[in-house]
Amino acid sequence: MNRRIYFQCLLLVLPLALLPAATWGKTVVRGKAGAIVELPCQSSQKRNSVFNWKHANQVKILGNQGSSSSSFWLKGNSPLSNRVESKKNMWDQGSFPLVIKDLRMDDSGTYICEVGDKKMEVELLVFRLTANPNTRLLHGQSLTLTLEGPSVGSPSVQWKSPENKIIETGPTCSMPKLRLQDSGTWSCHLSFQDQNKLELDIKIIVLGFPKASATVYKKEGEQVEFSFPLNFEDESLSGELMWQVDGASSAQSWVSFSLEDRKVSVQKILPDLKIQMSKGLPLSLTLPQALHRYAGSGNLSLTLDKGKLHQQVSLVMLKVTQVKNKLTCEVLGPIDPKMKLSLKLEDQEAKVSTQKMVQVLDPKAGTWQCLLSSGDQVLLESKADVLATGLSHQQPTLLAGALGGTAGLVLFAGLCIYCCVKCRHRRHQAQRMSQIKKLLSEKKTCQCPHRLQKTYNLL
């Protein structure tokens, strides 16, 4: 009876013995496209072991040959032959890994490691991230990131931005309008049912202006500089600054230029506009003097192969005028609605307005101060001196009359003095002539030469 049972068991085990090798099971390895992955293969035999790595279709990838001291690997006819190797220093430890470099999506599949009469299956799953339309985009453009790879295991997916914020979950991540803060490394975190995890990343570069807009506050006569720094330097582009003066119905082109190899070439400048442009980066424009007719806003547009970039720029100025009995402080150029305009006499209460103009009727004499402020910060300041209000209406007429009267008196006094001096001189001369004639008639004149000469001079 025991022999019969033994014989039946032998018949059951015999087919297994006829198999070419025993299968250890399947190991799953996950990798990232472009990276390096190591497929494991372990054996209890540590020396003089012969191993071979094959595809599922039995095409040889790599194996060893020779004794333990002089063993070397041989590559087969696999498409991976130029991207695979093994770690020879680990063979004596019973480890025969297959190292695959520069992973590709089509490397996913089943790999078989045969050591002696045993074999091990390794399932390689390759994943990658793709960016549409590109990894280098302009500020304001849209971006879609997609996870590609085998659907085996259905991992849970989580996306994180360069700011380490969780954006979305799922195989895709969409950003309809990119910000400059979105420039950097985006990561995709995969969690599998076997508790293993995989992290993939992709670098996104967002090109643009670090500042969305720029406002310059200047007093009349000061130099104005518009600066347009960029977060890139290696792009060729063309640009134009369109400017709309405050109160104008349309904008006009102030300057057009091109940038190539980090050098700026000016194409055209508005006639009679004294403006200078930098010859390199960062882009900048300079007005020698701020004039009221320049106050307004503009749009700098840059045209690149990938699209267009825009930046708003403004020039804000203050204008203080006095017409008859009215003192006016006015803002020229665009301002934030939260800004305040104030007009005050020194040490007096200010008249404040959120509009672009503030006026004072019959202003008192003194120094008036016009301020444009945002919160506690003073952005612009202008001063005006006002004379006494009592003279404000009649001052020009009275001044002209006073000046005319004074001039008349001076002329009259001068004429009188001249006439008096002239008469006195003539009377004195007549008296002298009379005296000389009398002396001559009486023959009492001196005959000395010097006296004769004096007499002749008098005559």
UniProtKB/Swiss-Prot annotation:
Compartments where located: Cell membrane
GO biological process, one term: cell adhesion
Leader sequence residues: 1-25
Domain Ig-like C2-type per the UniProt entry, residue ranges: 130-208, 209-318, 319-374
One annotated Gene Ontology cellular component of this protein: plasma membrane
Cytoplasmic side: 420-459
Subunit description: Forms disulfide-linked homodimers at the cell surface. Interacts with LCK. Interacts with PTK2/FAK1. Binds to P4HB/PDI. Interacts with IL16; this interaction induces a CD4-dependent signaling in lymphocytes. Interacts (via Ig-like V-type domain) with MHCII alpha chain (via alpha-2 domain) and beta chain (via beta-2 domain); this interaction increases the affinity of TCR for peptide-MHCII. CD4 oligomerization via Ig-like C2-type 2 and 3 domains appears to be required for stable binding to MHCII and adhesion between T cells and APCs.
Protein name according to UniProt: T-cell surface glycoprotein CD4
